[in-house]
Structure formats: structure tokens, C-alpha cells
């Protein structure tokens, strides 16, 4: 199964029908959902994997969540979705306020609390794992970053492929571009996901990283696939009635990786045709999230 390591928090999504009235009331629509990039990927992947078997476990999440009622609720949501929550309970559960302006622009106020304080993960949490996915958010904050590197080392020891999502151009810049490139080189992921801003920040087009597959998303524009044999692009089907972009990138990763692990685990040859199918699966799942509030697939 797919295993993801990272954050499990509450998302508080605020839609503004008009500009924010500073110092006064602003009528808004507010929705509270489970959030965190890692938990998003795990839930979306589980929804795919458990579609035909409602009693199965579709994905695993390694995370730390608060020893509080909110933490209990988030774990319950994971279990209902078909995720195996391998979590440490300690401290206070984190929350992220996502403010969506009338033009769709998102501003996030983050309080990750205990979600960045994971110290370690036992080896048996990797039993039955076929692929480990790591959002780069998990590499930027201690002690989660050290725990994540230890999990990656365990994955390598068990011959479990690792994939990385670049997550955030601004956080990469704050972390240090050269330092981030060195981390990627050390991790040796099978796949690196990024959007155009992240690809530009990492200098992927001018100074390629030695990764078997780089996937560059560009919203509604074609997705670029870069392998050691060259590059190709895949057209993106238009999406109507977009409600919220929160979690769409995580949904793409989940859809892509579900197809990828079914085709490529244990296989040495990567073909453009099969990779295109992975991209299409990613965008198909992302479209469902784009039509739903927050990082959910409530609208089918």
C-alpha cells in the first residue's frame, strides 16, 4: 500500500464573497475539514484503493496529532476514509486557516502545533508498504524532518521506492535552494512532483536533478514529464465549476501514484504511454477536488 509521512491538521476554509473588511464584520462561508498535505494524499489514495472493497485499508499515514478531542476526530475521519493511521498522540492538534478571496487566491494562516514534532516511527509501520510518499513540508521543520529522513532510510533498507512533492516554492527559498537540491540528491526519489513555480525555484530546466522522473504541473496547461530519456507533455482536460483549489495538487499526486505503483513497482522500464495514463489519473482525481470545498471529494 501507499504510505505517506507528514502533517495531520484541521483546515478552516473561509470563503470571502467580497474584500475583507478590516476592523469590521465580513460575511463569509466557513467550512472545517481534515487537512495537511500528507493526510490529503493518504485519504485521496485510500478512496481510490477502497472503491471496490469498503472493508480494506487503502493507504497509511505516519504523523503526529494532538492528544485532544480534535485529534481524535481527525483520526476517526482517516479511518472512515480507509486510511491506516499510524500516529503519535501528543500535545495540541494544529490548524490552518485558509482564506479564499473572491478571485480564488488563497492565503493561509498556519499553526501546525504538534504536527511537526514527530520524533520517530517504528519499523513495523512499514509492513505491507509498497511506496513511501513524502511532501517536502515534512523536510522543512524539526523534529519532523529528522524523523522523515529516518523513515526514508528505513524505506531504502526495505527496498521501498520513495517519491517527493516539492510542496512550496517559498518554503524551498527559505530553506535554501542549494540545500534542498542536496536533500533531494541524498533521498534519491523515484518521482519528484512540482508545479511551475517550484520547478523554477529549484532550477529544474536549467540545472536538472538526477531523478528518474520529474512531473511538472502547470494548472490547466499541459503537464511536463521529464525522464532521463527526454521530456514529453500531457494535455489537461478542462475543469468546469471550480469551487476551491485546496488539496488539488495532493489529489493529483494520489491519483498519479495509485496508477504508478500498480504499473512500475518492480519494473525497470518506464514508457511514455503508461506515464500518460498516470498523469490522466492524477488530473481526473484533482478535478473532483477542484469541484469540492476544501481538500475533499464531497462533490462527485
Model-predicted regions and their roles:
Residues 1-3, 204-300:
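Conserved phosphate-binding/catalytic region of the ribokinase-like
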Residues 1-8, 75-88, 100-232, 265, ...:
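Ribokinase/PfkB-type carbohydrate-kinase core domain
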Residues 1-60, 73-76, 96, 242:
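Glycine-rich phosphate/adenosyl-contacting loop at the front of the ribokinase-like
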Residues 31, 62-67, 82-94, 212-218, ...:
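Beta-strand->loop->alpha-helix junctions that form or flank phosphate-binding loops
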Residues 38-42, 71, 148, 164, ...:
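A general structural signal for well-ordered alpha-helical segments in protein cores
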Residues 45, 195, 249:
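Short, conserved phosphate/pyrophosphate- and ester-handling motifs at nucleotide-, phospho-/glycolipid
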Amino acid at each position: 500500500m501507499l504510505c505517506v509521512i507528514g502533517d495531520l491538521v484541521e483546515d478552516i476554509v473561509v470563503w470571502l464573497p467580497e474584500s475583507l473588511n478590516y476592523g469590521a464584520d465580513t460575511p463569509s462561508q466557513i467550512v472545517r475539514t481534515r487537512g495537511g498535505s500528507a493526510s490529503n494524499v493518504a485519504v485521496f489514495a485510500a478512496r481510490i484503493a477502497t472503491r471496490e472493497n469498503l472493508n480494506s485499508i487503502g493507504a497509511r499515514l505516519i504523523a503526529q496529532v494532538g492528544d485532544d478531542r480534535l485529534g481524535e476526530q481527525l483520526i476517526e475521519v482517516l479511518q472512515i476514509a480507509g486510511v491506516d493511521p499510524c500516529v503519535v498522540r501528543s500535545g495540541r492538534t494544529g490548524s490552518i486557516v485558509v482564506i479564499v478571496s473572491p478571485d480564488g487566491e488563497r492565503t493561509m494562516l498556519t499553526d501546525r502545533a504538534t504536527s511537526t514534532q514527530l520524533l520517530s516511527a517504528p519499523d513495523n509501520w512499514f509492513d505491507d508498504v509498497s511506496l513511501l510518499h513524502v511532501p517536502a513540508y515534512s523536510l522543512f521543520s524539526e523534529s519532523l524532518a529528522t524523523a522523515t529522513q529516518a523513515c526514508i532510510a528505513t524505506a531504502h533498507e526495505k527496498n521501498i521506492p520513495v517519491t517527493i512533492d516539492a510542496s512550496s516554492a517559498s518554503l524551498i527559498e527559505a530553506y535554501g535552494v542549494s540545500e534542498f537540491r542536496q536533500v533531494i540528491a541524498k533521498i534519491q526519489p523515484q518521482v519528484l512532483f512540482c508545479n511551475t513555480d517550484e520547478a523554477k525555484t529549484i532550477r529544474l530546466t536549467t540545472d536538472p536533478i538526477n531523478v528518474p522522473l520529474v512531473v511538472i504541473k502547470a494548472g490547466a496547461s499541459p503537464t511536463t514529464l521529464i525522464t532521463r530519456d527526454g521530456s514529453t507533455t500531457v494535455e489537461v482536460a478542462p475543469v468546469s465549476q471550480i469551487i476551491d483549489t485546496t488539496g488539488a495538487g495532493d489529489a493529483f499526486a494520489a491519483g498519479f501514484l495509485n496508477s504508478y505503483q500498480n504499473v512500475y513497482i518492480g519494473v525497470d522500464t518506464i514508457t511514455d504511454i503508461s506515464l500518460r495514463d498516470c498523469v490522466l489519473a492524477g488530473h481526473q482525481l484533482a478535478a473532483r477536488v477542484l469541484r469540492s470545498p476544501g481538500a475533499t471529494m464531497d462533490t462527485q
